[in-house]
Amino acid sequence: MVLVLYETAAGFALFKVKDEGKMANVEDLCKEFDTPDSARKMVKLKAFEKFDNTSEALEAVAKLLEGAPSKGLRKFLKANCQGETLAVADSKLGNVIKEKLKIDCIHNNAVMELLRGVRSQFTELISGLGDQDLAPMSLGLSHSLARYKLKFSSDKVDTMIIQAIGLLDDLDKELNTYAMRVREWYGWHFPELAKIISDNILYAKSVKLMGNRVNAAKLDFSEILADEIEADLKDAAVISMGTEVSDLDLLHIRELCDQVLSLSEYRAQLYDYLKSRMNTIAPNLTALVGELVGARLISHGGSLLNLSKQPGSTVQILGAEKALFRALKTKHATPKYGLIFHASLVGQAAPKHKGKISRSLAAKTVLAIRVDALGDSQDNTMGLENRAKLEARLRNLEGKDLGRLSGSSKGKPKIEVYNKDKKMGSGGLITPAKTYNTAADSLLGETSAKSEEPSKKKDKKKKKKVEEEKPEEEEPSEKKKKKKAEAETEAVVEVAKEEKKKNKKKRKHEEEETTETPAKKKDKKEKKKKSKD
């Protein structure tokens, strides 16, 4: 036997199909519901479960929209549909009913035609329920369902923040444009005022109050400017190099000043509104990064829910996509931060610590966004706790740098830096003080010293190689020093011997020249004359 489940605003109805053979011909099923009598021959009401109130109806319909049976529907089917085949309009609902209640469910074109026919003759198939009763029920349920959907819409509040931050950025651009226009326009008449007053709002207020610069000496600017700036303004107005302007020009300049002031007032109101909305919707995110940065992150992500699905690495560079893709294309270093760079925590950090702090802040920001988007609590305790942790980490990083600068780094200074002759072994401590080597005193020529330098270098290299190859056979430092001293003395003695030999040869040569006889000198002179002739 086939039973048809039909959902209405008044309750659930089960209809029994009298002639199941007609379901085979789908095209002719619609003809069976042309009249109430033919419809009664096709189906018959078996059971009806009425909703007690609107809240019960809303709960049941909300479950059906999700593809799941409500608690009342499960009880109704268990009581009236055991061992029967159930025809349903939603295949997903049929799968859940079959899995949980063990009731066979069908869903095909014939079932849809049956439901269409039942809908057309519903008030005739159920006695005591007319259109005048069903219409207000349907209207009330539709309104309740609309409110339910709006209540749990993920985009209902994000839109306000996205539009507010977008308008705030546009107002900043307009304010800057209008303020610069006022400065350029009024600068022809009073150019010195631009250097005296740097703030755009104060500049517009002063221009609106003063008008022509001649009036500056008679006016009181104490409500707008400080005493020193007011004195400078009045002094500059007397000796100004600007040109004269007509009253019509001043009228338009003052109207532009009114526009600047009205825009600045509205911007302040809009900022207060954005601040209140951010504290209500995303309190933890606001506690970590502030109202403006948090609102820009939500606007860039599309919504708070979409932003909560992003990992920390994506949130860290959100807003720097152009730089990221350029770096990937050119194979350079990728950016370390995007919109999160404007957070106060990143701004407080030193330049070399900004990357670390932005990475930590992005990780905590993602956690805060997920709590705000999916959590039930509306307080900002989690955001304040994470902010305190990040501030402690920042102080820790700065403290390490201060410790390195002041000399309080980890470990003690290595004594090898100050005494290179110290041995690294357990028995090798600081070597004894060096004594003056008297054997090294000698009068040597520059050439002999130069010739000795390469030989000494070679000897040192050979000794180093031997020491590296046989580290285990190292002798105590005192013996090595004695050997070095002996080698140096031997080298000096050899050089001294060579010098003595050279001096002896020179002396012999001089003696031979002095011992020559005058006869030999005459013979030499005669030989020279003959050679000339």
Swiss-Prot record:
GO terms for cellular component: box C/D methylation guide snoRNP complex; nucleolus; small-subunit processome. Residues 413-424 have a biased composition (Basic and acidic residues). Pfam families: Nop, NOP5NT. Residues 401-433, 445-533 are annotated as: Disordered. One of its GO terms (biological process) is ribosome biogenesis. Keywords: Nucleus, Ribosome biogenesis. The keyword Nucleus applies. Residues 281-399 form the Nop domain. Residues 521-533 have a biased composition (Basic residues). Required for 60S ribosomal subunit biogenesis. Belongs to the NOP5/NOP56 family. This is Probable nucleolar protein 5-2. It comes from Arabidopsis thaliana (Mouse-ear cress).
